UniProtKB/Swiss-Prot annotation:
SUPFAM superfamilies: Zn-binding ribosomal proteins (SSF57829). InterPro entries: Ribosomal_bL33, Ribosomal_bL33_CS, Ribosomal_bL33_sf, Ribosomal_zn-bd. GO terms for cellular component: cytoplasm; ribonucleoprotein complex; ribosome. One of its GO terms (molecular function) is structural constituent of ribosome. Keywords: Ribonucleoprotein, Ribosomal protein. Belongs to the bacterial ribosomal protein bL33 family. PROSITE patterns: RIBOSOMAL_L33 (PS00582). It comes from Malacoplasma penetrans (strain HF-2) (Mycoplasma penetrans). This is Large ribosomal subunit protein bL33. Pfam families: Ribosomal_L33. Gene3D superfamilies: Ribosomal protein L33. GO terms for biological process: translation. NCBIfam families: PRK00504.1 (NF001764), PRK00595.1 (NF001860), rpmG_bact (TIGR01023).
Amino acid sequence: MAIKKSIRLECGECKEINYLTFKNAKKHPEKLELNKYCKRCRSAKPHKETKKK
């Protein structure tokens, strides 16, 4: 059974947490980085994975 890890995606520029998602930590152990829309910056910026507390 796959172990899903809850993660937050944080804007690389303004450091605001905009997205919550899950990932399979066993298949993808590396940190996730996606180009997503940031409400505060009002443009698409790279969002990096942070741990959910």
